[in-house]
Amino acid sequence: MVEFAITFKPDMAPERIVHLTKQAEHNGFGYGWIFDSHVLWQEPYPLLTLMAVNTEEMRLGACVTNPAVRDWTVTASLLATLNRISGGRMDLGIGRGDSSLRVMGKRPTTLADLEACVQTVRDLCAGRKIVYEEKEIQMTWATAGEPPVWVAGYGPKALRCAGKIGDGVILQFADPHLIKWCLQFVREGAEEAGRDFSKIRVMSAAPVWVSDDLNEARDRVRWFPALVSNHVVDLVSRYQPEELPPELTAYIKNRKGYNYLHHAEVGSSNAEFVTDEVVDRFCLVGPVEEQIRRLKELEDAGVTQFNIYLMCGDEEQTLEIYGQEVIPACQ
């Protein structure tokens, strides 16, 4: 059974984020995530605090942070504090980094740093002593436990890393074919580490637009494949063409560039190169019946959580339709 989540772009008023979070929990969404890009948008952790005190059961986290944007001990302290505030409802979503670093002219971090950061955060949140930068430290007050860790990735190496260290993996598209391709590497990483792949949770994250008007629906979400293209550009510089599926890479050939000041923005010129075919594969567009059909395809591909990037407008209506018509049909 697929569980449902939402992700906010933190450019909304805090009061609106609280309102939508409460509505989402009421409508059956079990997770509330938020982007972490502190220059482009508001800082996520105060907003997660508001989300925590205004919900009862919803699990919460950043989707995603990275090892380079904050000292690892700060990330651990933030999560451990929020775990106490929320009653142990925090998760950690983490990747190598994109907009929060690139907007400052920095590059994504290494997988070695990602792995080390995850272990540091786990240990500190569990109250264990560690040696950090040659100094023994311990957060003795951290008593709410380790947050589950979701690792974001696209390429074989990052996906194997997710299988090695993650409680879950974050895949930013809703294409069952690409998800199956990704999961083979997650499985390899898990098996190489002696872990049970079947226990690793799988998130498909993408925007949706429920409408019979496909032209409007596609235009509302066209920004998303453009966002994904930033990661694809990085991939094609690291791998040989035959190592990557053309369904993931071919669409960027007409990409002219990307302006992070219009990151994840409806109607952005960043998305001018994105075709309808790519939109239809990467996102969920169309009437309720089509949404349900696509979600069942994702579940068959191995997805355990579908995470709606709730930032395309008419957010209340999307939550209402999903809560009343889509989620019940998928459970």
For each predicted feature, which ranges?
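N-terminal beta1-alpha1-beta2 module of alpha/beta enzyme domains
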Residues: 1-63, 147
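Hydrophobic faces of well-ordered beta-strands that scaffold small-molecule active sites
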Residues: 4-8, 32-34, 59-63, 90-94, ...
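Glycine-rich, proline-tolerant flexible connector loops at the mouths of alpha/beta enzymes
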Residues: 31-54, 66, 98-101, 173-176, ...
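An alpha-helical appendage that flanks or caps ligand/catalytic pockets
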Residues: 107-139, 179, 184-300
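Alpha-helix-loop-beta-strand connector modules within alpha/beta enzyme cores
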Residues: 45-65, 124, 192, 320-331
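Active-site mouth loops of central-metabolism enzymes
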Residues: 2-15, 65-73, 143-154, 208-211, ...
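Short, acidic/polar
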Residues: 12-24, 78, 153-161, 221, ...
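Conserved, mostly hydrophobic/aromatic
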Residues: 28, 51, 82, 121, ...
